[in-house]
């Protein structure tokens, strides 16, 4: 009887599927075309619960976004930012994140500073520090 229960338990456990961790990712690269201009790529998982999350950039930046297109497991949106000053010292917000989707953010500045952060449903705004982070 115990053997039968063990086999039955293993059969049930093998059939369980877990949630695939597929975070959204925002990559922002400073460009040399103009001071405080950035090329960004917003990659949002196609398999998501609810409406697609959107990025709110600082008010001092004008945003030019292309139509999103699917690529692999993500919906890709290319964005051009032209800002009046650096992104450092300002916040970026992601609205409509789902419970199962976190958002990674990577900013590559021209002076080789790199900022990386994580946003989620409870903490959907991130402040980009003025000073570089050292870990």
Q: Would you name each region that the model predicts?
A:
Residues 2-3, 32:
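Extracytoplasmic entry segments of secretory-pathway proteins
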Residues 3-13:
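Sec-dependent N-terminal signal peptides
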Residues 17-135:
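Histidine-/acidic- and/or cysteine-rich, low-complexity loops and terminal segments associated
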């Amino acid at each position: 009887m115990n053997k039968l229960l063990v086999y039955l338990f293993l059969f049930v456990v093998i059939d369980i599927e877990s949630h695939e961790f597929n975070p959204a990712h925002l990559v922002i690269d400073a460009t040399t075309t103009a001071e405080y201009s950035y090329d960004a790529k917003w990659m949002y998982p196609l398999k998501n619960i609810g409406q697609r999350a959107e990025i709110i950039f600082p008010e001092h930046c004008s945003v030019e976004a292309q139509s999103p297109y699917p690529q692999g497991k993500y919906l890709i949106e290319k964005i051009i930012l032209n800002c009046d000053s650096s992104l450092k010292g300002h916040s970026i917000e992601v609205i409509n994140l789902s419970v199962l989707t976190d958002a990674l953010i990577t900013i590559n500045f021209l002076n080789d500073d790199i900022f990386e952060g994580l946003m989620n449903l409870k903490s959907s705004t991130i402040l980009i520090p003025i000073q570089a982070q050292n870990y």
